[in-house]
C-alpha cells in the first residue's frame, strides 16, 4: 500500500508541475470566466475541471467546451497548487506540448486512481 500511495503522489505531482509550467509560460489560466474567454479564443485547448467542483458548474463548462479534450482526475486543491492559490476548479491549457504531456500523465493518474 505504501508504494501505491507514493506512485499516486508522484503522478499527481507530475500533473501539477506540468500545469504550473504551462502557467509560467503563459499557456494556462484558471477560473470560470478566464477559462471561458480562453476557450472562446483558443478552441484547440485542453480543459481541466476539478472532480470535486460543484456539479452544476462542471456541467455548464462541459457544455460550453463541447469537443474540447477534458481531464477530470484532479482535485480542486491539487489544481490550486499550480496557480498558487487554495483551489482552482476550472483550468485551460493552450495547444502546446505541455498539454499533450498533461493528457498522457493524467490518463495514467486516472487509471491508477480507478484501480486504487
Task: Tell me the role of every PLM-derived stretch.
Residues 1-48:
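Extended interfacial segments that mediate partner engagement and assembly in macromolecular machines
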Amino acid at each position: 500500500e505504501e508504494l501505491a500511495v507514493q506512485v499516486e503522489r508522484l503522478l499527481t505531482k507530475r500533473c501539477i508541475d506540468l500545469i504550473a509550467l504551462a502557467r509560467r509560460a503563459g499557456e494556462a489560466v484558471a477560473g470560470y470566466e478566464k477559462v471561458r474567454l480562453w476557450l472562446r479564443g483558443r478552441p484547440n485547448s485542453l480543459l481541466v475541471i476539478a472532480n470535486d467542483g460543484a456539479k452544476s458548474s462542471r456541467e455548464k463548462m462541459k457544455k460550453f467546451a463541447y469537443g474540447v479534450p477534458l481531464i477530470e482526475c484532479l482535485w480542486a486543491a491539487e489544481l490550486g497548487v499550480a496557480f498558487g492559490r487554495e483551489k482552482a476548479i476550472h483550468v485551460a491549457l493552450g495547444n502546446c506540448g505541455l498539454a499533450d504531456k498533461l493528457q498522457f500523465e493524467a490518463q495514467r493518474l486516472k487509471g491508477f486512481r480507478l484501480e486504487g
